[in-house]
């Protein structure tokens, strides 16, 4: 792992949380810093998940510091699964760390699947978070309600696979159309080919992510070959 990749242990409410921070070699004046949350801990979800990893590389290629971490009970993280309640505290711990590392820099909360459910919910209510990215929101899973997004007016990008087995396209379109007007105005929904995991189409997903961020932050650097570690 090179000098701008840092393996760390965050201070969490249930104990230490295993994490990796990728930061640009020149991090002075970065326009935002990102937390990226992984999929369901009970179904082999970790910060090394391929969707999470590719999204992290896309952020890194734009010069955005990105923090991935393992939720409680995953990998070397202490604690145990808490049905999303304690995992919200884990996200807050990650945001706290980024806020200390990059004072006064706006934060981006992002996540894939379960990680989107938890990460965006915390991000909607945290004043330090100015924008959100959700990948593969499993809205058909009634155990993971995304109703909070209906009133969340922070700028957000939601990227879905056209054949997501946990969120039918027509159902997702209806879901997003039911947002409050101010939330609709702040939300961009993009469908790309592929299933829930964007299998065979990760490049399309990351291209959408990059374009949205470059549109919002023209001062971001042009994409460069992303991290490989």
Regions inferred by a protein language model and the residue ranges of each:
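N-terminal cap/lid segment of alpha/beta-hydrolase-fold proteins
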Residues: 1-29
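Short, surface-exposed "cap/lid" segments of acyl-processing enzymes
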Residues: 26-70
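Alpha/beta-hydrolase active-site loop
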Residues: 51, 81-101
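Acidic catalytic loop of the alpha/beta-hydrolase fold
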Residues: 162-167, 197
